[in-house]
From Swiss-Prot:
Coiled coil: none annotated. It comes from the Eukaryota. This is Topoisomerase I damage affected protein 2. It comes from Saccharomyces cerevisiae (strain VIN 13) (Baker's yeast). GO terms for cellular component: cell projection; cytoplasm. The keyword Cell membrane does not apply. Keywords: Cell projection, Cytoplasm. The gene is TDA2. Belongs to the TDA2 family. It is found in: Cytoplasm; Cell projection.
Length: 104
């Protein structure tokens, strides 16, 4: 899997771009290496989102995180048939118990 960050505002991110790419790649690799997960039957994108959000929370719980995975399935794509499917899964995470106030 190739991971790229395009047109994002990674300069505002709690993680540097390179570290974020590494975090996502490590999460994906751990899914592939897990023998108990059947990648052909389970929703890999949801599992990946969960892993990425867990790692981001470990990095810092001061932020709100939104993770989105878009999957393009081209199994039915050939010269005679232009069928494909596109799926997008989204997950979010934040620490609801932490409230930040500015006292003036």
């Amino acid at each position: 899997m190739q991971i790229e960050i395009k047109d994002g505002r990674s300069d505002n991110s709690p993680l540097p771009e390179r570290k974020l790419v590494t975090l996502i790649q490590e999460s994906y690799d751990s899914l592939k290496d897990d023998n108990e997960i059947n990648l052909s039957t389970e929703s890999t994108s949801n599992l990946l989102i969960k892993l990425v959000l867990e790692k981001l929370e470990k990095h810092s719980s001061l932020y709100k995180y939104i993770a989105s995975v878009t999957t393009l399935n081209i199994e039915g794509l050939n010269e005679e048939n232009a069928n494909f499917s596109l799926k997008n899964d989204i997950g979010a995470s934040w620490e609801s118990k932490k409230r930040w106030y500015i006292q003036l």
